[in-house]
């Protein structure tokens, strides 16, 4: 009999579960203040829904043996977009939804078998808010949610902002047969490979300059304007930054504009964001998202104007980040009381006392064996991390 969990799986212990719940509740309270309602999409979906029209690769989906092609969701957005365009199609837009739940990703290493990585997520989806207004609400909400987590200056929280169309505009001048290769090298920040491609000199120079454009938004926008000229896209990005920069400063979150930013899933066709913090050894991404109008369009009636934008927090990553910095919240079940008794005949009154404490809202637990005296009971309580003993003698 196997005594270890499956490859990629983890046992969550009571403290882990309690902190995860606390983090998710802090985030949900923020979402609800912004008018978002909670939904729970199914863990199982049809493969064509999960693959989101090619945005997610089939090897990333944990497939389930069934009469039809089913899989476990690798992310939440596709399932919620499907529900929004079918079960919730009659509801007035914009539609504001939030969720919490586990996602499952299939990962394969060259010399290893399949690993199934389960991750707890908390996030929002905003359907029917097009353009700048939807993007601005999403980023303001993300900053608000991030500010309600106990992150410190040592975490150096940074919000990376990119846009799918930025790189596409630059790639329009590239020979079509080379575009996917150039995109891969640019997103991978591979200067050497980019320099070796058969590209016109000015075009290569512009792409190499693009690799340097990453950092403070105003400076990056100026650099992009020098490369692209004044465009509506840059004007919209400039306006978006102006809407969020003051709130980001108050929240202690640095803004970084990165034209080469490319997320793991190719869901996005507009603005893209990732909230990154400094861990003990390396940066840790705790939230990500963006605009996915094409995905919503896929689930919508032909000819309908559809739009969607959203983000999700990786709850486990947040918990581990707080654990490393010793910034976890105090015991989350209140000040627990231990009820102890002296002999077997006192079990009944001890349980009655336990019930009274529970009815008054006091967390309490019963020690199941008789104790010789109160000192023994207090010693047991101390070992269990409990300060208060209620004695039935």
UniProtKB/Swiss-Prot annotation:
Q: Where in the cell is it found?
A: Cytoplasm
What are the protein's UniProt keywords? Answer: Amino-acid biosynthesis, Cytoplasm, Histidine biosynthesis
Query: What's a GO biological-process term for it?
Result: histidyl-tRNA aminoacylation
Q: Check the record and name the PANTHER family matching this protein.
A: HISTIDINE--TRNA LIGASE, MITOCHONDRIAL-RELATED, HISTIDYL-TRNA SYNTHETASE
This protein's assembly is summarised as: Heteromultimer composed of HisG and HisZ subunits.
Similarity annotation: Belongs to the class-II aminoacyl-tRNA synthetase family. HisZ subfamily.
What function does the entry list? Required for the first step of histidine biosynthesis. May allow the feedback regulation of ATP phosphoribosyltransferase activity by histidine.
User: What name appears for this protein in its UniProt entry?
Assistant: ATP phosphoribosyltransferase regulatory subunit
Lineage in the entry?
A: Bacteria, Bacillati, Cyanobacteriota, Cyanophyceae, Synechococcales
Instruction: Quote the gene name from the UniProt entry.
Output: hisZ
